[in-house]
From Swiss-Prot:
This is Probable ethanolamine-phosphate cytidylyltransferase. The keyword Nucleotidyltransferase applies. It catalyses: phosphoethanolamine + CTP + H(+) = CDP-ethanolamine + diphosphate. It comes from Schizosaccharomyces pombe (strain 972 / ATCC 24843) (Fission yeast). Its EC number is 2.7.7.14.
Amino acid sequence: MASSSNIKHRLWLDGCMDFFHYGHSNAILQAKQLGETLVIGIHSDEEITLNKGPPVMTLEERCLSANTCKWVDEVVPSAPYVFDLEWMRRYGCQYVVHGDDISTDANGDDCYRFAKAADQYLEVKRTEGVSTTELLDRLLSSVPLEIYSTPVSVLSSQIDLLRRFATDSDGLTPFTDVFIYNTEKPETLISGTTLLRLNPEKNIIYIDGDWDLFTEKHISALELCTRMFPGIPIMAGIFADEKCFEKPMLNLLERILNLLQCKYISSILVGPPPASLFASSKYIKLCFDEQISKVYYPIFSTDVSIPALDISLSNTPNNSFYKFDKLGSDLIKQRVMLRRQHYEERQRRKMGKNATEQTTIKTYA
């Protein structure tokens, strides 16, 4: 963490941001802690394809994911793949931030060589154990869940990482509450500030699901809730790996971190059953020491032919979100499988680049 004397005003961080995961958000968080304003540049589909193979997510989807991260102040689409000092300066940024791994272009040259030569380069720690390449490998190779699963019981060993991700938009002060589901009473894993943000009626919205891959469908649902019901905090319930409706591509820890980085989420309940299978309203009130008056469950339009989601609030749990939860993940998985040969070739190219860059992609354990 930078001291106040070392804080920079405007910083630039760029990348593909494909399969937006906690490796991306951890780099963003570290960068935010170095400056006041963080601008994220997102590479175009064409430049990514040229330099490393086709992305899974479209430029629009990748920009949406970055915009949803609470530590991001601005997003610039179609940023050059090879870092350009003049491009960065156009947006008033003084330094570019990148992880401590080497990133090379199609010719094998360091993408940030010009920034380093100009002494306008800052470095943060690369996140080991997660990458777009790793996630694609899980899907293409049908890696068994037990290889990468994270049980609820080990989350306490990741408390420092979770607490960092539970910070507010400044990357420093507490924000998100995190609770662990136990049958008798909830366990507080991280204390946040949800109660301070309650509206005068002291209501909360609860949405539960697998939350796998954290797709455009998830983001659209959360944004709609926030826009239509301002002032009502959103609590996300997230199922344990073995309790998901279908095998998740991300493990529990990875899915929690995706929720924690999202600016729309105020609190998280880890490992509950589906809301309709337990006294969820009563239980959620227990999480907040009975200071919640009412728990609402959103009802989303289930007509996927309608371009815009429709939403209302109910006093009782329903299954409408599960359809969007599954649909978003399924669309991404189908996209990969339809272009399987392209992505397998991308994997081979990337692994070859890893050897050149001396980057080791580790399986999370």
